[in-house]
Amino acid sequence: MKSQILKLQQTLTKKPASINPLLQQIDGAINEHWSSNFLLKNTVEWAQAQAPKNRSKSPLNNIPFVLKDNIATKGIVTTGGSRFLEDYIPPFSATVFELLNNSGALLVGKANLDEFGLGGTGLHSGFGFVHHPWNETLIPGGSSSGSAYAVARGIVPFSIGTDTGDSVRRPASICNIVGFKPTYGLISRNGVYPYAPSLDHVGIFARYVYDVALVSDEIIKHDKADFSAQKSPDAGKFTRSLKESFNKQIKIGYLKPLEEWFDIELSKKWNSLKERITLEGCELIPFHFPLELLEVIDPVYKLISYSEAVSCYSNLTGIVFGQKLFEPNQASDFSKTITANRDRFFGEQLKRRFIIGAFGTDKNNFTKYFEKAQKIRRVMVDAYLNLFKEADFIVSPSASGFTKTIAAVQKGESFTNLVDDFLQLANFAGNPSITIPWLVKQKDQTIGLSVNANCFHDKQLLQVAAWLEELFQIEHDD
């Protein structure tokens, strides 16, 4: 089973002194790719100071990684991709960063993202676009754009992102890597800037499923500091499970209505997949999931997530912390001061989404819109999770087509449909979901395969993903 982490660890074990040349090499790669805007902060110097102190027995010891810049790092600027927090240095670290730090992993950079995670293209950071790793005219997907870029270009063997609607799995699909979102609450969100707390997940990028399992063993741990934390029945056993024999006598479901949205090329690849896994001994189950539910996934997602977001960031006033146009004692009007600060330092996309969220939670609209959206979400989740009573896993393309150009997205051309929206169901339900490389037309035109399991079946999901990964045999360019 392929693993970049183990390969690198073997080199470091044989030649401990090779850590310094490795970090210098990464520093050079970061500088070479700096114009792609995938990083907001180069922390290689921090890693160089940390490496000699590491004594961990973890497979991640002295393994470099990149962290999405909405995850707090004590003493290191954490912007959330927003000009509002351009100079903000957290006095604490997120639990997920502390766990990685304790494992000996070395932070070499803070990754760019759509502002506070509210975006799916990589074009809405306060610090400029993130470009596709293999074609600067294309979008990389978002919001965890920089984290995906770093892994796709081989700069680091793994990175950490966040996934509220598909923000790990969509860029993984576009960048031809693995993106894993575990069951809700298994990776602590303590110290992670929120977008929509009922939907937010921390996720992992890597080139191979085995590396995702290695990282999962280190960061899927119950955290009392996270009120939404849940305990995994398989914590610490994910890597070990991939070495066990895999029973291919499984039931794999798919949503039949989505096939109508496939283009010719995607349909051909999809039919080939169904034939292959049937030949391998799996049972395929077509589900006629209600079309009326699929059609409202995206509006329900937007209403709930934007409403939660506007509440989460109500503390960004510029009065206590964050950027400000002038000092509070110079302000003549409190409300006007906050409005001026937000207008100046928030991006246009963020402001539009906050307006929608404020509208949905207004006292005159709450019952009509937000409360109704929550009820529809419940109906969706019940219908979706019921599928796992008949199937062990549910598969789907991770996108309806290849990624689009930056120019096309800026023009507002529609480029998603129900196939793309399907990924959001795993955030509504909180079940584990993974994207693995699958359809490769050329290195800048790829579509991943989404594999989903029932809640707390993360171990089984990684097992089937590793098996499918071996079937597909996708090669990576450095």
UniProtKB/Swiss-Prot annotation:
The active site is at residues 68, 143, 167. GO terms for cellular component: glutamyl-tRNA(Gln) amidotransferase complex. The keyword Iron does not apply. InterPro entries: Amidase (IPR000120), Amidase_CS (IPR020556), Amidase_dom (IPR023631), AS_sf (IPR036928), GatA (IPR004412). GO terms for biological process: translation. PROSITE patterns: AMIDASES. Its EC number is 6.3.5.7. GO terms for molecular function: ATP binding; glutaminyl-tRNA synthase (glutamine-hydrolyzing) activity. Keywords: ATP-binding, Ligase, Nucleotide-binding, Protein biosynthesis. It catalyses: L-glutamyl-tRNA(Gln) + L-glutamine + ATP + H2O = L-glutaminyl-tRNA(Gln) + L-glutamate + ADP + phosphate + H(+). Heterotrimer of A, B and C subunits. NCBIfam families: gatA. HAMAP family: GatA (MF_00120). Allows the formation of correctly charged Gln-tRNA(Gln) through the transamidation of misacylated Glu-tRNA(Gln) in organisms which lack glutaminyl-tRNA synthetase. The reaction takes place in the presence of glutamine and ATP through an activated gamma-phospho-Glu-tRNA(Gln). Belongs to the amidase family. GatA subfamily. This is Glutamyl-tRNA(Gln) amidotransferase subunit A. It comes from Mycoplasma pneumoniae (strain ATCC 29342 / M129 / Subtype 1) (Mycoplasmoides pneumoniae). The lineage of its organism: Bacteria, Bacillati, Mycoplasmatota, Mycoplasmoidales, Mycoplasmoidaceae.
